[in-house]
Amino acid sequence: MDTANDADRLQMLLYSAYDSDTVRDMERPLLDDGTPLMRMAASAAAQVTMTLLDDEDLAVEDARIAVLVGTGDNGGDGLYAGAILAREGAQVTAIATGRSLHDAAFAAFVHAGGRVLVLDPNADIPGCATGFSAGEAGERLQAAVEYAQGSHVILDAMTGIGVAGALRGIPGTIAASLGLTSRLPDRPALSNNEPSADLPLGVAVYPPS
């Protein structure tokens, strides 16, 4: 086994960005073969999160984690990762930025003890509030931002390879409120009393046209 090359490939996957078509081409044979990519991505994200917490001498059961969750499969990745972390004892809240959630991942997350904060008044998520007023929507957004700002780790699972252009609507608003619209942080865990990590589960980019 060529472990040196394996390590190089892992580093490349962790720290490189690929356009959406390339990601789809890489995924297609694995999906055709029935590889459980969503569960694998979630497990990897959860493991990286636990490693970051350990590096900061913070026990998982003492950690407060925010998962920014969109409606698609990337949101499912985040929910499954959140479920793993919740089962390990972390306090995990999923901040739902869209009107629905990946059904199976949502069920796994709730079963693991995760909590859900819905931001869209038109959301249709089982067991969660819906049809609330514009005033309450603003209060929920503020609560979500404050929760994320006070979290040790933020998992960004709002969008995946299906998105094009800048973030809009609730995802755009919450990203701007958290200061996540510019460059990535210099290091994943900040040197303060409450380390924070922005861990995109997947970043797909198109080159400028």
Predicted segment positions?
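Glycine-rich phosphate/dinucleotide-binding loop and adjoining beta-alpha-beta core of small-molecule
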Residues: D2-Y18, L58-S209
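Positively charged, low-complexity intrinsically disordered leader regions
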Residues: M1-D62
